[in-house]
Amino acid sequence: MRLTIYHTNDIHSHLHEYERIKAYMAEHRPRLNHPSLYVDLGDHVDLSAPITEATLGKKNVALLNEAKCDVATIGNNEGMTISHEALNHLYDEAKFIVTCSNVIDESGHLPNNIVSSYIKDIDGVKILFVAATAPFTPFYRALNWIVTDPLESIKEEIELQRGKFDVLIVLSHCGIFFDETLCQELPEIDVIFGSHTHHYFEHGEINNGVLMAAAGKYGNYLGEVNLTFEAHKVVHKTAKIIPLETLPEVETSFEEEGKTLMSNSVIQHPVVLKRSMNHITEAAYLLAQSVCEYTHAQCAIINAGLLVKDIVKDEVTEYDIHQMLPHPINMVRVRLSGVKLKEIIAKSNKQEYMYEHAQGLGFRGNIFGGYILYNLGYIHSTGRYYLNGEEIEDDKEYVLGTIDMYTFGRYFPTLKELPKEYLMPEFLRDIFKEKLLEY
């Protein structure tokens, strides 16, 4: 018997591209003279797309239904960018199996409509699908989820199903380095479908006998794995990717649909808020002030590139605010000494990333822009640092409000190790909208 498995990962609500992939599968799957499956590896949802924001991911699930998805798992965007309740209802209308072994609530229950593993019987061959997602522990904790060690959860689930399956497939939203470890730890795995780190393999990769397959990001590729079975075991396995550029174009209206769904008015009077990458504008000041107030901090730091578009309108809608601040970025409250706060101010004053093309960590803009400091100051001639007009004391504890993308080590390594509290699920646009109501 032969089985073809199509796979996508990290679509991130690039729904026009996904529609092309969906059309390709709709045309080609019926032509196969053997069984086929389609699996998605998570991060299909991304709230930077208006239609995804407006439907809290339900549109993405509807598209997966239309694509005749068979099995899917969750990525950090499904798990961490919507509320606890929203994840519990995300898959209410799903016509496919959603599996993830390492996210539970405080009572030990999986999210609604999600199973810890799944066995699919195809012509007598029993295929076990086990999945896990990346363990961003503090973020899940802030949303009242518990994320467990993915390696241990996968091992435990395999042992629970031992004797019930012929073929073992892992759906991993944990990244390529985790997948490589998994190959060494569990060589009995037949295929690992990978994601999260946006990697891809043109023809798959065999690692310790395990076939690794991955299809990049944003729908740039559709993955295809072909398995041949004899006596209920895999005897041959190959992988390839199909570039998006080789697929026919289609017409879509996702942006217009999202705009319509977010057309409700927020402010009914003229607003002029412009952005700049290299100096403080009123919009940047208001955003920094919003972060400081929302985090109940004494000061705040943001970057100007967070403001992606101007708002110059006689009336402001939800869509306008989303376009200005499309990022799935949360706020964070950091406690730190005066010494550490001075280090952060000094580093921000260097403006190392002002004109850098930034990507990842939730950032959905283009240019990073200059740092905007709120309630913080530095007098170069005296070498003194100030908070709200008072000199910062080395041994005193302060509270800084900022954004989660600064806490991963890329921009401010100091922040990675400091005690912090992530404030979720509100995004920058949510707190900025509240500030604009005072405008």
Predicted regions and their residues:
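Acidic, metal/ion-coordinating pockets
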Residues: 1-243, 280-285
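Short helix-capping/linker segments at secondary-structure and domain boundaries
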Residues: 296-298, 439
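C-terminal, charge/polar-rich interaction regions
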Residues: 285-286, 296, 304-307, 314-315
